[in-house]
Amino acid sequence: MVIQLIKLDHIRKTFRVSKRDPGLKNALRGFVKRQYDMIEALADISFQVSDGEMVGYIGPNGAGKSSTIKVMSGILTPDSGECVIDGRIPWKQRREHVANLGVVFGQRSGLWWDVPVGDSFELLRDIYSVPADEYRRNLDRLTEMLDLRDLLKTPTRQLSLGQRMRCEIAAALIHSPKLLFLDEPTIGLDAGSKLAVRSFVSELNRERGTTVILTTHDMQDVEALAKRIILIGKGRILLDGSLSDLRHRFEGRRRLTAEFSGELDFGENQGNKLFVIPDGASLVDIQVSSGSSRAVFELDSCPVSRLVAALSEKVELTDMSVDGTSIDEIVLNMYREYGI
């Protein structure tokens, strides 16, 4: 049975932002009579997330991602709408809510800057009232999985960015939360650190069933972790679907290059080597040399697996590659279509 952990229904949030023109005269005028703009950060946000899901919550800068996370964390109170997480309203039952919530902000630290990382973990244990045996189990497991053993005695300010982010994730999980919000968790990290963080989050979801909401501009994070994508733009949900659906809709055409022994007949001659190209695919180029062939196909609606299976029935494939649109280009195409 699928359990609904998060429910947002018609959430709206508007901020009043002061404004003034540049110059000393306008600055003095601003002291007497301030002017304000009303910025609608969240226009009408509705979605649900099931227990154990990993969801990529994406959108351009200023789309409303962080405001949504703050509402779900209990930091912001919306102007209207309903938000229920694990049976609680975050801003009304904040103490109970945060006891089951872990949050990692890539550009803000949840650790104490001047004390060793291990001391920060001890303080968090007291804040969340984590039993000693559970704390020890969690710390040992997080230390091993995130390779923190050599960092526990080091003050936070002396850590590299990659080291600090691994410690931030451990700090967010020290109390065994059911729900984890990751806001730009790999910002500024090198390739090795990014892979380590992605691997850990994936394993955490698989082993513990932790629900993960990921907001990021790094589409490699989304591709590696999230099966479902929610796109927000100008304070509204524009798309909610699977990553595979997103690819199918915005990827455009892919090309499959196949190398094989012998030749294939793509013409009208009837024979054992006559190859009928599956619907949704077309031949772009064919080269034959020294008893081997190289064919390039363009794929529209035809799945790669269908074309490969059809080729394998006729020839022995020696090499194959698929060139598709990168996840970053797909998301850019999506932004363009929605005008955000």
Please provide the spans of the model-predicted regions.
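Conserved ABC ATPase signature
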Residues: P155-L159
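Conserved ABC ATPase "signature" region
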Residues: G23-F31, E122, D126, E134-L151
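Conserved catalytic motifs of ABC-family nucleotide-binding domains
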Residues: S176
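ABC transporter nucleotide-binding domain
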Residues: R198-E298
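Catalytic Walker B motif of ABC-type/P-loop ATPase nucleotide-binding domains
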Residues: L180-E184
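Conserved ABC transporter NBD signature motif
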Residues: G81-K92, H97-V98
